[in-house]
Amino acid sequence: MQLATDAVGAQDRLRTALKGVGHDVVLIDCPPSLGLLTVNGLVAADRVVVVSEPAAWASDGVAQMLRTIERVRDRQRTELVTAGVVVNRLGRTRDARYWHEQLVASYEDLVVGPIHLRAAIAEASAQSLPLHALGQRAGAEIAAAEFTALLAQVVPDLSPKDA
């Protein structure tokens, strides 16, 4: 699919390609940047989950993304909803806790999750497996439960059988 090589209509290409797709939910995982691919995803989306990490400058990155979402909403005249800001890879360090608290303080109404840093997530990703497929491995069940809870928060109208 050619999305961003031609400037004319580039922002609408993904939305156009997804028209008529026979699915109730389509997850678009965008790169951690504010480039054309992310804008394509935002234009095609109905709701957005902003993913951040508990680190310095994270709040600035979230603010930039929220401004970009607002610009897309205004220019495309869409009903684009910010479903939440999720803090990903939340570790057990004092530094991680501090930056998580800063994000919560800045965006308290939007923060959902978090998703904790767990080896099971990296293991599932490396094996191209869903977390639920890791079974009894340490942390897999807890990590899967965090993602299930996050999904319920950001897509509350999705029934459990659809998840």
Descriptions of predicted regions:
Residues 1-34:
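Cytosolic-facing regulatory segments adjacent to core modules
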Residues 38-56:
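Inter-motif core of Ras-like GTPase G domains
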Residues 60-81:
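Anionic-ligand binding region
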Residues 89-93, 100-132:
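Beta-strand-loop-alpha "switch" segments that mediate conformational coupling across diverse proteins
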Residues 124-150:
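C-terminal boundary of histidine-terminating zinc-finger modules
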Residues 151-162:
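Short, hydrophobic alpha-helical segments
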